[in-house]
Amino acid sequence: MRFQPKTVAAAGLLALCSFAHAGEKIWISLGDAALAQLQKHTPVAVNASVAPSARLAGTEGTTTAARGTEGIHLVQVDEDDLLHLSGAVHRELHRCGGFMFHPSQAEGLATLQRHSGAAKVAAAAAITRPSYVIDQQAVVTPMLNQMQASNIGQTIIDLSNNVNRYYQTSGGVAASDWLKQRWTTLAAGRSDITVEQFTHASWKQKSVIATIKGTDNANEVVVLGGHLDSINQSNTSETGRAPGADDDASGVASLTEVFRTMVANGYKPRRTLKFMAYAAEEVGLRGSQEIANSYANAGTNVVGVMQLDMTNYKGSVNDIYMYTDYTDSAQNTFVTNLIKTYLPTLKIGTDKCGYACSDHASWTAKGYYASMPFEAAMGQDDPYIHTANDTYANTGSQADNSLKFARMALAYMVELGSDGSVIGTPDKTESFTGSLTKNQTRSFGPFKAGVGTFKASTTGTGDIDLYAKRAAVPTTSSYDCKSDGSTSTETCSINVTANGDAYVLLKGYAAGNYSLTVTYKPQ
């Protein structure tokens, strides 16, 4: 078979159309390097001559006119050729992906148009740019210390126990169902959290989305994603073994630990947080594209996106690599500063992965701010991916490397989740009066306290001591703060780092009357 190419022009962007004689015809967009691999490794020839005016600036943020350029092409190919293309990109370019699937020529041309500078500026104008101020140390640091590599490792094991998670197999379906149940169990008791599957009409596997609804700034959304599917490029059948432990059970497991830790601490964000496990990444970013398209069509104000694709293999000298192409430079700087603030011992590198190397590209194409921190420099990542050997054992049967990414991602989600343009609700004040005899105690609460200062104070007669505690009623020997002077004028404060219950105890050291005032930030 040979391609008979023709050029399709739209808004000054190059598109190549090729015709073959077997297999279903589909449209993909791809960069220069991937196009060269397509020309080389498929039994066809695509002769492309890309004029400078038809080349697109590599989208490193929103101000990249002076940087290098890369041609992006729209090509119609046999679907059977995608595995050959994906394998060639992995084998010879030492990276994943490299192309985006499009359901039609019109959709593909629209994607190319959105990659133009003018379209990106227009799209970004409708999206809120966060402040990127780092000021949530009191909330973030305690949670970082609670995160466990063993939890991440177990999720990697559970996901990779499927024969495969390919987007068209029963294993891919089962993995989606399992993850939905896992996240639902973690979220039990939280009415502000929903877990759902996103159905894709053209294939079997569903994406999974967990949502923590924001409090007073819920219309702004932060997304943390990874891809759920796996692939064995030598065998995509029901029985083809594709454990995908690093690619990308590790990313999904990392964001699951972020979700678990937030829920365990009762964290309630101001912005809405979404945790996404995308279907069908390995075949052209299909799942994330459908989701990003639906959010863009609905006008959803997604203020930040982070992609975790492969986190558990340390193949390079640095710990985390920020990929600078087809990502947002301002958000990349913010993530780098987060690592320096919360994980100062880690070494940070930068690299590029080319067009459409993972799901962040789907969001970038819609004008959203996206970042892609990665486990290694390009070409030094896990050598076992896309084979039956991408196992937990081949990353040392540990998840210490993934824990670094999970901690970074939690800092990202809390710092952005706690921020926003809407002014928060004022402190709540509750007052109580009464009297106590000598040695008599009386407890108050629970007070549904949000992040901030919880303060209790008393005035009155006699000598009444004051105690306060988070999560349980205090006693005279178990408390977070106390004030036990020689009068009934006492004050006690607690720094609340996550939403939860708080309680107050009064004890009559000597008989007296009291007036108790409790002030706190409501959840």
Could you say what each language-model-derived stretch is?
Residues 448-455, 499-500:
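Extended extracellular/luminal ectodomain segments enriched in beta-structured repeat modules
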Residues 425-443, 459-498, 509, 515-523:
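Surface-exposed beta-strand/loop patches in noncatalytic accessory domains
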Residues 61, 154-213:
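A non-catalytic alpha/beta surface segment that caps or lines the substrate-entry region
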Residues 204-207, 238-330:
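Acidic/histidine-rich catalytic neighborhood of metal-dependent amide-processing enzymes
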Residues 317-424:
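Active-site-adjacent substrate-binding region
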Residues 113-169:
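N-terminal hydrophobic or amphipathic helices/low-complexity stretches enriched
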Residues 138-147, 160-171, 196-198, 236-248, ...:
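Second-shell loop/turn segments in exported
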